[in-house]
C-alpha cells in the first residue's frame, strides 16, 4: 500500500512516516513503477508500536533499541525494563516542574483582582519585569 493509505490506517501524518523511515525505524517494501514507496502490513504494526511508545513519551532512540531487542526473542528483558524505570524518573521530574509552575501561576493569578484596570494588573507587571 502507498504511504497515504498507511497514514490513514495508522492516523500518523505522511511526513512523520517518512521521518521514521529516514531514522530507520521502519522501511518500505520497495517502490512502484511510478517511484512511490509501498509498505506491507508489517509496517502498519510497526507504526502502531511506535505510536504506542511515543504515547509513553519514549524517545526514538529508545524505540530503536527496543526494536533491535525484539529481533532476538531470547534477549533478556531487563534492558527494556530499565528504559521504563528511567522514563518513570523523567516523568517524576516533569511532574515536579509542573507543580512548581502551577504554584507560580496561582501566585500570579492571586496578584490580580478583577476590580483593577489592565494598567494596574499585577500579572502584566510581573511579566514585564526583566529576569
What are these regions (language model features)?
Residues 74-131:
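C-terminal regulatory/oligomerization modules of transcriptional regulators
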Residues 41-42, 73-75:
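Short secondary-structure transition/capping segments
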Residues 1-68:
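Basic helix-turn-helix/winged-helix DNA-binding cores
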Residues 51-54, 70, 87, 112:
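Alpha-helix boundary/capping residues
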